[in-house]
């Protein structure tokens, strides 16, 4: 049975560290069916002179808020990235109680250099907890695989309230 798509004649790098090889890559759906010469597919993409690689994983992004107004997660989706991880810097939007939306927006405004009004207009606040945030992102969908860490700033504010700005955390 022919593949759905054959990526023909590109230099295939498999991620193992071995040198690339010129080959065809046959796909059925989104699964690689075969790598080799002269493969047959219903559609073909000429990759002569191009690198064919596994999708890249960007382990440090700031898409926490952007995921709501840019499901394509640009520019990562333009560069072969297939999975993004948000929340590395500790400045995230979840978890967040409604009374702290402005504080989280202000933090992002300072860190990301974005206008607070634009952030407020773009963020969909249909969540409070971190699992609710991840569920909302999944339900809305993204062009890339998306995952995130819980940001330190948002977590402190969620647990300690405004005291997060005043004192160190304690076991209490």
Regions of interest found by a model, annotated:
Residues 6, 26, 58, 85, ...:
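Structured core elements
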Residues 17-18, 57, 68, 160:
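Short capping/connector residues at structural and topological boundaries
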Residues 51-75:
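Di-metal (Zn2+ and/or Mg2+/Mn2+) metal-binding site signature of metallo-dependent hydrolases
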Residues 69-172:
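Divalent-metal coordination cores built from histidine and acidic residues
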Residues 11, 61, 82-83:
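Ser/Thr-centric signal marking residues that sit
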Residues 1-55:
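Histidine-rich, glycine-flanked metal-binding segment
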Residues 8, 40, 63, 150, ...:
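Residue-level signal for pocket-adjacent positions within structured domains
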């Amino acid at each position: 049975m022919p593949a759905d798509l054959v990526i023909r004649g590109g230099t295939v790098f498999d991620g193992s560290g071995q040198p690339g090889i010129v080959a065809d890559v046959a796909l059925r759906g989104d699964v690689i069916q075969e790598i080799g010469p002269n493969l047959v597919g219903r559609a073909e993409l000429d990759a002569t002179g191009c690198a064919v690689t596994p999708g890249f994983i960007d382990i440090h992004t700031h898409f926490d808020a952007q995921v709501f107004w840019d499901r394509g997660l640009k520019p990562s989706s333009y560069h072969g990235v297939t999975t993004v991880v948000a929340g590395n810097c500790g400045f995230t939007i979840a978890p967040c109680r409604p009374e702290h939306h402005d504080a989280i927006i202000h933090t992002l405004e300072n860190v990301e250099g974005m206008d607070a009004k634009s952030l407020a207009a773009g963020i969909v606040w249909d969540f409070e907890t971190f699992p609710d945030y991840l569920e909302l992102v999944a339900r809305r969908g993204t062009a890339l695989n998306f995952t995130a860490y819980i940001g330190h700033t948002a977590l402190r504010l969620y647990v300690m309230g405004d005291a997060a700005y005043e004192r160190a955390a304690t076991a209490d």
